[in-house]
Amino acid sequence: MASTVTQAAERDDPADWLRLIRSRRVGAVTFHRLMGEHGSARAALQALPELARAAGVEGYEVCPLGVAQAEIKAGRACGAQLLLWGGPGYPAGLMDLADAPPVLWTRGDTGLLQRPMVAIVGARNASSLGLRMARRLAEGLGASGQVVVSGLARGIDAAAHEAALATGTVAVMAGGVDVIYPEENADLAAQIAAKGCLVAEH
């Protein structure tokens, strides 16, 4: 299945991948199963209404092309790059996961996604000792060649990102690659986009 989807990532229209994963009742596991069964996102999209009908869901409609095109336009407008599972730049460390995100939006240095990574996450309302320890840990990991991954939250996440800016840091964002939360970390997010990498599924 992996080789089939990898080939599809190289030849498919990215809009079809977005339409498939944004369609109702299609999560990551279902996406990968459909791709394995049908060989391409477009073929899976064509099959979905009948598959839904067989499962008792009438009037099923796939995600419209215009929605996917609007997402691509918005992504490009904010300087983001779309990575497809199995395609160039997609993180090798996610490839073997059954529920790996089919698509990732990124801003920044995608080369960091191929390097060894360590996640540092913790309390938003961290103590001063906790913040110092997070910075020290992130600096040490960065110096040893590890990319520090965190979630751009206030507290431990922000401290880890800041300490690893010079050596490589990746922020995984829940709300979207163009949605900075909390707002107080907007400057940090801009620095990560310039020196590291922002990653999101939307």
Locate each region found by the language model.
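Short, small/acidic-rich helices and loops at N termini and domain boundaries
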Residues: M1-G89
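Glycine-biased, small-residue-rich flexible motifs in mid-sequence functional cores and linkers
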Residues: M1-D13, L84-H202
